[in-house]
UniProtKB/Swiss-Prot annotation:
Localization, UniProt: Bacterial microcompartment
Keywords: ATP-binding, Bacterial microcompartment, Kinase, Nucleotide-binding, Transferase
Gene3D superfamilies per record: P-loop containing nucleotide triphosphate hydrolases
GO cellular component: bacterial microcompartment
Protein name (Swiss-Prot/TrEMBL): Probable acetate kinase EutP
Any single biological process term in GO: ethanolamine catabolic process
Length: 159
């Protein structure tokens, strides 16, 4: 599998998803620095996203990854996507994940519309990171991409 970076605002659910994809469904602690797993995937701090003074750190961190997974809470009506981020990652596969779909104030339809307007494409994944079946949809999708690319099939953004 290629290297993945998880990006999104503070509290979006990046670390919870990062952990869930590794089979860890315990409560996530706040990410204070860039963290890596055994495969080299990267969990980025939300501060990199929320504060323009940290954009350079975010851009530098994303240089060597193959895929961006953008995590946006279904209970967050605003886009905080740094200007130009999708352009920087134009050669990288970009996947949008709508997290926190189980929250009482979640508005999945509005979040999907916001992400489409921002420039993300389908498929998008609606997740409750504490529900293994919900997370499995993303796991299966990532595995299918890997299998296609290993078989030499072209996928969107494959090189």
């Amino acid at each position: 599998m290629k290297r993945i970076a998880f990006v999104g605002s503070v509290g979006a659910g990046k670390t919870t998803l990062f952990n869930a994809l590794q089979g860890n469904y315990t409560l996530a602690r706040k990410t204070q620095a860039v963290e890596f797993n055994d495969k080299g995937d990267i969990d980025t701090p939300g501060e990199y996203f929320n504060h323009p003074r940290w954009y350079h750190a975010l851009i530098t961190t994303l240089q060597d990854v193959d895929m961006l997974i953008y995590v946006h809470g279904a209970n967050d009506p605003e886009s905080r996507l740094p200007a130009g981020l999708l352009d920087i990652g134009v050669s990288k596969r970009q996947i949008a994940v709508i997290s926190k779909t189980d929250m009482p104030d979640a508005d999945v339809a509005a979040t999907r519309k916001l992400l489409l307007e921002t420039g993300f494409e389908e498929p998008m994944f609606e997740l409750n990171s504490h529900d293994p079946q919900s997370v499995q949809q993303l796991v299966d999708y990532l595995a299918s991409l890997t299998k296609q690319e290993e078989a030499g099939e072209k996928t969107h953004h494959s090189e």
